[in-house]
């Protein structure tokens, strides 16, 4: 039995055909001010040998961290970052309503900015730039270098396809 694919390469769809998801990531606790404070406290290295003040505080801060995590999952608060074959989108709520986005032709570089407290998670902010101008920011992205690399690779593919037409 043969199947006919709608695209020449499995999983690859031309941007002008339809928008498809490449990758979705959820912000860490490092996206929130309270989460960054928790990260800063847990990063304190003062101590003796294996034991540090930060590790002790990490144990004491488990309950507030869980509370912040549950808060981040509330329907009016939850967010996710969706990379498609056309743009990068911040989606809000349980249904993933597009809140704001940046098209691939609106930036030429992505910087990783690790704010105090985010390094403990490990997380960082992705700063999308067009020249020296910040055009978009994703807060508290987990393992930001991976998502940055995927965004840039997808952007290159999009712009390459657009130039060839």
PLM regions with names:
Residues 1-165:
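N-terminal basic, Ser/Thr-rich segments that initiate or prime the first beta/alpha elements at protein or domain
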